Amino acid sequence: MKKIRKGDSVVLLTGRDKGKQGTVTAVLENKLVIEGVNIYKKSVKPNPAAGVTGGMIDKTMPVHISNVAVVDGNGKPSRVGIKLVDGKKQRFLKTTGATLSA
């Protein structure tokens, strides 16, 4: 069971965007794509056949999963634990003990 999932609210712990909060939009193997965080400018070549105009675009790049933490109800970073409830695994926040949605 993955500890961080799509839709979780997270905060960056390191890097140039340290302290910024966002929502996970995609989970890759060991990386997360977070909305509005780690945005880089990429150059795109024009492709008239596909209807793409060239130029600079803003692209959200992935962040390693070790550099983020889930945000608890108080807005503070928290680690995520897994416990068994009625024979099923349930994610919970270690700071408050609150359970996270499935």
Curated annotation (Swiss-Prot):
The record's listing under InterPro entries reads: KOW (IPR005824), Rib_uL2_dom2 (IPR014722), Ribosomal_uL24 (IPR003256), Ribosomal_uL24_KOW (IPR041988), Translation_prot_SH3-like_sf (IPR008991)
Keywords carried by this UniProt record: Ribonucleoprotein, Ribosomal protein, RNA-binding, rRNA-binding
**One Pfam family of this chain:** KOW
GO process annotations (BP): translation
Per the record's keyword annotation, is Ion transport included, yes or no? no
- Output the Gene Ontology cellular-component terms: ribonucleoprotein complex; ribosome
Q: Which GO terms describe its molecular function?
A: rRNA binding; structural constituent of ribosome
Cross-referenced NCBIfam families, in alphabetical order?
rplX_bact
UniProt xrefs under PANTHER family: MITOCHONDRIAL RIBOSOMAL PROTEIN L24
Task: Indicate the family of this protein.
Answer: Belongs to the universal ribosomal protein uL24 family.
Its function, per the record, reads: One of two assembly initiator proteins, it binds directly to the 5'-end of the 23S rRNA, where it nucleates assembly of the 50S subunit.
Subunit organization: Part of the 50S ribosomal subunit.
Task: Provide the protein name.
Answer: Large ribosomal subunit protein uL24
- Organism, per UniProt? Polynucleobacter asymbioticus (strain DSM 18221 / CIP 109841 / QLW-P1DMWA-1)
